[in-house]
């Protein structure tokens, strides 16, 4: 499957927003209407926050800036958006894990709950190869192969 060069961050932000919204939904005390407002506002806030810190050609660049973190203190972006739907800080702390790390990077969104939890991938897409040789001719030929190449010896008899 080939991908065109993609510079937008829509799938990654949608994955992050969907995950955070589902965490709020599981407790059942936030109405669907308020969750929709939260989702839209969070999508807008993250898009604005990340716009000068999104580097598809170097996905790890800016990763710390894009990281959403709850470590007994609420991430400021989540706090701001939650206040728009009337959720207070204490309510947020009841609804969300006390320790959550959410990495929103080009081509991958992953999270960890707790300091020692496993990292789980929410969204993953293979990065686009550039014309600068991320895929060499040899690698391109090997891509379709499921088994290692066989070695052949050619002999010439006289």
Swiss-Prot record:
It comes from the Eukaryota. InterPro entries: Anti_prolifrtn (IPR002087), BTG (IPR033332), BTG-like_sf (IPR036054). In brain at embryonic day 13.5, placenta, amnion, and spleen, which are proliferating and/or differentiating. Induction: By nerve growth factor. At lower levels by epidermal growth factor and membrane depolarization. At much lower levels by fibroblast growth factor and interleukin 6. The modification Phosphoserine is found at residues 147, 149. Pfam families: BTG. GO terms for cellular component: cytoplasm; nucleus. Transmembrane segments: none annotated. Phosphorylated at Ser-147 by MAPK1/ERK2 and MAPK3/ERK1, and at Ser-149 by MAPK14, leading to PIN1-binding and mitochondrial depolarization. PANTHER family: B-CELL TRANSLOCATION GENE, PROTEIN BTG2. Interacts with PRKCABP. Interacts with CNOT7 and CNOT8; indicative for an association with the CCR4-NOT complex. Interacts with PIN1, inducing mitochondrial depolarization. Belongs to the BTG family. This is Protein BTG2. It comes from Rattus norvegicus.
């Amino acid at each position: 499957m080939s991908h065109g060069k993609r510079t937008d961050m829509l799938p990654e932000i949608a994955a992050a927003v969907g995950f955070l919204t589902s965490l709020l939904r599981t407790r059942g005390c936030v109405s669907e209407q308020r969750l929709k407002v939260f989702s839209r506002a969070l999508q807008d806030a993250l898009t604005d926050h990340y716009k000068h810190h999104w580097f598809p050609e170097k996905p790890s660049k800016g990763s710390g800036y894009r990281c959403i973190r709850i470590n007994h203190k609420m991430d400021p972006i989540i706090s701001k958006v939650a206040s728009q739907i009337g959720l207070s800080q204490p309510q947020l702390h009841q609804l969300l894990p006390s320790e959550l790390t959410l990495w929103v990077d080009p081509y991958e969104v992953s999270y960890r709950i707790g300091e020692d939890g496993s990292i789980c991938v929410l969204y993953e897409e293979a990065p686009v190869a550039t014309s600068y040789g991320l895929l060499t001719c040899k690698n391109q030929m090997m891509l379709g192969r499921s088994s290692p190449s066989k070695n052949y010896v050619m002999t010439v008899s006289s």
